[in-house]
């Protein structure tokens, strides 16, 4: 057994390889496996010129996510940033300069999370009218989008990304937030720009926060039965600016996790052999989506954690304030969890980390899963689908954090008689956490 060194390893002195490469875009599992073979459950990597620790092991990722007394999220803990060693134009920096519940610690985080959970509760409660009204609206919007890309024809080509998987969560956001004027696709594209990093990231963050803050101010004068109004009503009260930041965080989750969970679920079916397809579609849609949460989670690498003190993790001793990236995708591929793609790993398993774990587990996971299962269910009930490109030619985003397609071309044929797929749950109750905490 190898023991961590007594002194912390200095990231700057380690020879680290870039994480985001062509291999990572097309075959991320092989990159994680190579890093695991070389370093064990924790590996030093270069993230656009800044060295960070990538956590690969299932047990180690779960430990980091669960223990907020050791692992902090507020960027003020980042030693390299405090010391001025992070370039001002580092592509991911804009996303860390906005304070919301995803990037807060301790009591400040608890206050934000309590407010968001209270406001979200009726939209995730199976007995509340708001939940089934939203679920019915999502189903109706899914049918509208299918009718729109089919345009009255029996068959044709569609981009399921732009014409369905991005559009449906956006329609849900418009309804959930109570936007007086429906937001367009540019809202989700700004989320992409922020998450993927680059020269437009800071401006994208500014536009998103401005839109949600303006909405909060509008709803203060024009309340409705929506999430924004409910956030304005929580006690102790939040400022309009705070509400704008929390709504911004929810938009990011909806655009990144929900839209790509839809396309990844459809791809899981279409890329399989005929027997695999039949097996996947024979069970409830929830089982298919749960399988995809394990085999192809949309949010592959989470936002930074920072050890509050020098800490042993894997085969290294990490220095206080080092940047640490918990990798959901790598954890799900850990041989200690299960063999990637195996039946044991993916069917009927609830022990996944796709929605996180611990104090920062996604508070809207029930709502998100409702949208995904409804979307996938309606697609397969109404259409026969085939891939428009070979699997190895599908265009993946170049992103540290997200595994999703830039576009998803398919050939569809409308069904003359709908073939029922096991229906998703009527409402979006969060239920038990996928990963017990």
Feature annotation, model-predicted:
Residues 166, 170, 232-281, 288-289, ...:
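Central I-helix of cytochrome P450 enzymes
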Residues 280-315:
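Conserved cytochrome P450 K-helix E-x-x-R motif and the immediately C-terminal K′/meander segment
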């Amino acid at each position: 057994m190898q023991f961590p060194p007594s002194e912390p390893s200095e990231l700057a002195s380690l020879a680290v390889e870039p994480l985001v490469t062509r291999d990572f875009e097309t075959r991320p599992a092989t990159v994680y496996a190579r890093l695991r073979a070389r370093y064990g459950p924790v590996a030093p990597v270069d993230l656009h010129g800044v060295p960070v620790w990538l956590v690969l092991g299932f047990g180690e990722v779960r430990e980091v996510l669960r223990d907020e007394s050791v692992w902090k999220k507020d960027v003020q803990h980042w030693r390299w940033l405090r010391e001025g060693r992070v370039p001002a134009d580092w592509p991911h920096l804009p996303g860390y300069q906005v304070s919301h519940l995803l990037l807060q610690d301790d009591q400040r985080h608890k206050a934000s999370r309590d407010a968001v959970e209270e406001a979200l509760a009726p939209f995730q409660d199976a007995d509340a009218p708001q939940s089934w009204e939203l679920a019915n609206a999502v189903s109706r919007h899914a049918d509208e989008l299918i009718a729109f890309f089919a345009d009255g024809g029996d068959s044709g080509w569609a981009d399921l990304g732009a014409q369905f998987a991005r559009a449906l969560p956006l329609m849900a956001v418009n309804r959930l937030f109570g936007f007086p004027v429906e937001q367009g696709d540019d809202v989700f594209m700004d989320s992409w720009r922020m998450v993927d990093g680059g020269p437009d990231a800071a401006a994208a963050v500014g536009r998103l926060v401005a839109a949600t803050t303006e909405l909060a101010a509008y709803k203060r004068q024009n309340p409705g039965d929506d999430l924004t109004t409910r956030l304005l009503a929580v006690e102790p009260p939040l400022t309009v600016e705070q509400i704008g930041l929390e709504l911004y965080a929810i938009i990011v989750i909806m655009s990144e996790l929900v839209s790509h969970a839809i396309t990844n679920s459809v791809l899981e079916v279409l890329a399989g052999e005929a027997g695999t397809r039949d097996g996947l579609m024979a069970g409830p849609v929830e089982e298919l989506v749960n399988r995809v949460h394990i085999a192809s989670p949309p949010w592959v690498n989470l936002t930074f954690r920072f050890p509050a003190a020098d800490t042993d993790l894997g085969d290294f001793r990490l220095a206080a304030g080092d940047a640490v990236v918990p990798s959901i995708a790598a954890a799900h591929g850990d041989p200690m969890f299960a063999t990637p793609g195996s039946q044991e790993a993916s069917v009927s398993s609830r022990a996944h980390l796709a929605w996180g774990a611990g104090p920062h587990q996604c508070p809207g996971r029930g709502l998100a899963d409702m949208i995904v299962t409804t979307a996938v269910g309606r697609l397969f009930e109404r259409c026969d689908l085939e891939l428009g490109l070979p699997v190895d030619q599908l265009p993946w985003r170049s992103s540290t954090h997200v595994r999703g397609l830039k576009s998803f071309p398919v050939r569809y044929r409308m069904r003359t008689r709908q073939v029922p797929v096991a229906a998703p749950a009527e409402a979006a109750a969060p239920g038990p956490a996928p990963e017990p905490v």
